[in-house]
Design a protein with these regions (language model features):
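Conserved N-terminal helical subregion
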Residues: 2-6, 23, 48-190, 233-251, ...
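Conserved mid-domain beta->alpha element of the FAD-binding
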Residues: 6-36, 158-159, 185, 215, ...
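Short, flexible helix/strand-to-coil boundary loops that buttress conserved ligand/catalytic motifs
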Residues: 42, 58-59, 68, 88-89, ...
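Acidic/histidine metal-binding catalytic segments
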Residues: 66-69, 125, 253-271, 326-331
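A short coil-to-beta-strand element that immediately follows conserved catalytic motifs
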Residues: 178-182, 199-202, 223, 244-246, ...
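Active-site substrate-recognition segment that forms the wall
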Residues: 201-236, 245, 249-253, 274
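C-terminal domain-closing interface element
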Residues: 355-374
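C-terminal auxiliary extensions adjacent to catalytic cores
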Residues: 371-394
Length: 394
């Protein structure tokens, strides 16, 4: 199909996964990363069975399984009482139901597995300090504009350039991302600093009124990932700002001492203000397509942002490899992904409101509802999500 390389704007998880997927079906690509180095900002990431399906398709399943920490359960705790509300076991029955485990991994380790696979491919070229600013289409070619660099011609352009995508800005021309009013503070601490009574082999969520705390082990139990979020109605987006423990503490003075001690032990806290966008029905423009956060940014509450980007990469590369022309491939890709990702975007917001942050009677309703669900029922409720990540054959 292609006589020129695909150009991929963005060298994050979605961009590298797309390059690997395209190489799997015999297509070359050039990955353009705006930063001076390829890497990931952040710490832990949860990888559900659908993510492992993506890893297997991309040819990095074995490597990712070596990096992952396999937790025993997803645990929901009451941040006001200190008691467990419910948990979802991630045991043999879970793995038999979905064909893959649920695990956690350091984001940098996931990115590095993809990066090393890209470097080992003869079909992928990686370029740093290449910020894409726009594109122009003519005939069977797309010309990509790069800040302070010569234009680059390719067969197609994939905008995997994140929440503030320049490719999306030209294609969609919509408003800036929507500021959620939720502020997240992140820290990674050595395991010996984690309170002994909270060193659980679980992804643990302490849910409280307008706030929550998440923690789980990483890097072979050498460290714990701490993520605490406060719905403080902040209006301005912010990314990775260093913050004091005292400022983090302000949003959690009302919760039980047991989860609050997580904040006491956190170090080097950094602040993010969560943003998303309203879902859209189209992210294809001729020979240009969006992917991941550039197409469908979502809040963190379903722990599916990176998973959805990798599913996008699987779908796009599969359709490019099986369709007769690019128009058909991109149309099928959009059909594969639009409704599914819209559901995840909307559900992520709803989960934040009704599972993570309710208070009073709404919290009591949440507890009663979730305690009544059996593990088998949980598996069925999650099947639509965790069964993804494989190429659709229609």
């Amino acid at each position: 199909m292609a006589d020129k390389p695909f150009i991929i704007s963005g060298g994050g998880i979605g961009g590298l996964a797309t390059a690997l997927g395209l190489s799997r079906v015999g297509h070359s690509s050039i990955v353009l990363e705006q930063s001076s180095r390829l890497g990931e900002i952040g710490a832990g990431i949860q990888i559900a069975p659908n993510a492992f399906n993506c890893f297997d398709y991309l040819g990095v399943g074995n490597e990712m399984r070596k990096e992952a920490v396999y937790i025993d359960r997803l645990r929901l705790m009451d941040a006001l009482t200190g008691d467990e509300i419910c948990h979802i076991p991630l045991d043999t029955a879970f793995q038999e139901r979905f064909g893959n485990p649920y695990a956690v991994v350091h984001r940098a380790d996931l990115h590095n597995v993809l990066l090393e696979a890209c470097k080992a491919s003869g079909l992928i070229e990686l370029r740093t300090s290449h910020p894409v600013t726009g594109y122009h289409q003519e005939g069977g070619t797309v010309t990509v504009r790069i800040l302070d660099k010569q234009d680059l011609k390719g067969y197609a352009l994939i905008g995997a350039d994140g929440l503030h995508s320049a490719v999306r800005m030209q294609m969609i021309g919509d408003d800036p991302p929507r500021v959620s009013g939720h502020t997240t503070y992140r820290s990674v601490i050595p395991t010996e600093m984690m309170p002994k009574d909270l060193r659980w082999n679980a992804a643990t969520l302490w849910a409280g009124p307008k706030c929550h705390i998440v923690h789980y082990p990483l890097k072979g139990w050498k460290v714990f990932n701490l993520v605490v979020t406060f719905h403080n109605d902040v209006k301005e987006a912010m990314t990775g700002k260093p913050i004091s423990r005292e400022e983090v503490y302000r949003g959690f003075e009302h919760i039980h001492p047991r989860p609050r001690q997580v904040i006491d032990h956190g170090i080097d806290w950094k602040l993010w203000v969560l943003c998303d966008r309203e879902p859209i029905t189209n992210w294809v423009d001729g020979r240009v397509a969006l992917l991941g956060d550039a197409a469908h940014p979502m809040l963190q509450y379903f722990a599916q942002g990176a998973c959805m980007a990798m599913e996008d990469a699987v779908s796009l590369s599969h359709r490019v490899g099986t369709c007769n022309n690019l128009d058909s491939a991109f149309a099928q890709y959009l059909e594969d992904r639009m409704v599914r990702t819209t559901r995840v975007v909307i559900d992520s917001s709803l989960i934040g409101d009704h599972i993570y942050h309710p208070s009073g009677a709404q919290a009591a309703l949440r507890n009663s509802f979730m305690q009544a669900i059996t593990p088998a029922e949980w598996f069925e409720r999650l099947a639509w999500l965790y069964g993804g990540g494989k190429p659709l054959e229609n």
